[in-house]
Regions:
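A preference for well-ordered globular domain cores
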Residues: 1-82
Length: 82
């Protein structure tokens, strides 16, 4: 396996970064709550998750995957939550 951020990063590295960004936004907590109680995932978090997934799939179409795939300029801004 290639180290994160190293030249030649693979699909697993891109998905790891996507999951990290989703977790930082609290998506995991809302997703579990949705599964357990049926409560809807907040719209801004659901939209953010859709954007992150789109970016991850798009990065995977670039050959080779950019060395700086973890940089914020590729990814959507995290929603502001109170």
């Amino acid at each position: 396996m290639v180290e994160e951020g190293a030249p030649g990063a693979g699909p697993a590295d891109v998905w790891r970064e996507a999951r990290r960004r989703l977790a930082r936004a609290g998506h995991d907590r809302y997703h579990v709550r949705h599964q357990v109680t049926g409560a809807a995932i907040p719209r801004d978090i659901a939209y953010f998750a859709m954007q992150v997934e789109f970016v991850a799939y798009t990065l995977l179409t670039i050959v080779p995957i950019p060395e700086d795939y973890r940089e914020d300029h590729y990814w959507p801004s995290q929603p502001e939550r109170n």
